């Protein structure tokens, strides 16, 4: 996130806030928050307010340096799990500490029980270390893990169009603000979910140009928890 605008959008998405919510929390106007994003500018005083209110690093807010927040640093795997980047193809032997999981052509081919539709003929795979899968609570043998490309801009800037996501179909417990692959009336999407009283689910897009939706829990099938995503950024 090289711009102040991107970092503010990330903060809004991470905290589950709209621009007016952030403005209210900081005792300023929604137009001021909109100007921060539109003009890609943030005063040090405003950044200090955000830092004190929400715990974000001042250096990160103003300059994009370091980790956004201390609690996000705790999610970084230990060095023993970093490994190295190696070139490989389908003929490369699978190391003992890695597993292959299906890479589907589209989320439409994902099933909530981890199966893959026969129509998905590409046969592509992605490799994960067993340690990584154990760390996120997924099966270390890769069963129940599916990958596919995200489509559309509703989850930007966190998950842009074309990003690769990984879903653990064995983890369907809804935790407010986390990301899930869902199936609603045969429409499969990635969304941020919140539980509400009366057996309701709030379905939120990170891109605040999209309105929140509300649905009955019974009408929303949780395909699985989005535990990983990878973004390729092209040079402008």
Curated annotation (Swiss-Prot):
Cited PROSITE patterns: HTH_CROC1 (PS50943)
GO biological process: negative regulation of DNA-templated transcription
Gene3D superfamilies: lambda repressor-like DNA-binding domains, Umud Fragment, subunit A
InterPro entries recorded: Cro/C1-type_HTH, Lambda_DNA-bd_dom_sf, LexA-like, LexA/Signal_pep-like_sf, Peptidase_S24_S26A/B/C, Phage_CI_N
UniProt DNA-binding residue ranges: 19-38
A GO molecular-function annotation: DNA binding
Key words of the record: DNA-binding, Early protein, Repressor, Transcription, Transcription regulation
HTH cro/C1-type domain boundaries: 8-61
PANTHER family listed in its UniProt record: HTH-TYPE TRANSCRIPTIONAL REGULATOR PRTR (PTHR40661:SF2), PTHR40661
Protein name (database record): Repressor protein CI
Species in which this protein is naturally found: Enterobacteria phage phi80 (Bacteriophage phi-80)
Encoding gene (name): CI
């Amino acid at each position: 996130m090289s711009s102040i605008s991107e970092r503010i959008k990330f903060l809004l998405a991470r905290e589950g806030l709209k621009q007016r919510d952030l403005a209210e929390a900081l005792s300023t106007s929604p137009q001021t928050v909109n100007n921060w994003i539109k003009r890609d500018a943030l005063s040090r005083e405003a950044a200090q307010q955000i830092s004190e209110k929400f715990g974000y690093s001042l250096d990160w807010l103003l300059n994009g340096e370091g980790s956004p927040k201390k609690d996000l640093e705790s999610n970084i795997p230990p060095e023993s799990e970093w490994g190295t980047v190696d070139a490989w193809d389908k003929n490369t032997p699978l190391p003992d500490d890695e597993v292959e999981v299906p890479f589907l052509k589209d989320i439409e081919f994902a099933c909530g029980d981890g199966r893959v539709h026969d129509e998905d003929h590409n046969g592509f795979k992605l490799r994960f270390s067993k340690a990584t899968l154990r760390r996120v609570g997924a099966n270390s043998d890769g069963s129940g893990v599916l990958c596919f490309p995200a489509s559309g801009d509703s989850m930007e800037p966190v998950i842009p169009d074309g990003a690769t996501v990984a879903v653990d179909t064995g983890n369907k417990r809804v935790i407010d603000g986390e990301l899930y692959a869902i199936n609603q009336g045969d429409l499969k999407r990635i969304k941020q979910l919140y539980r509400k009283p009366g057996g309701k689910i709030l379905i939120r897009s990170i891109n605040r140009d999209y309105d929140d939706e509300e649905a009955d829990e019974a009408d929303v099938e949780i395909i699985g928890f989005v535990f990983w995503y990878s973004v390729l950024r092209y040079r402008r």
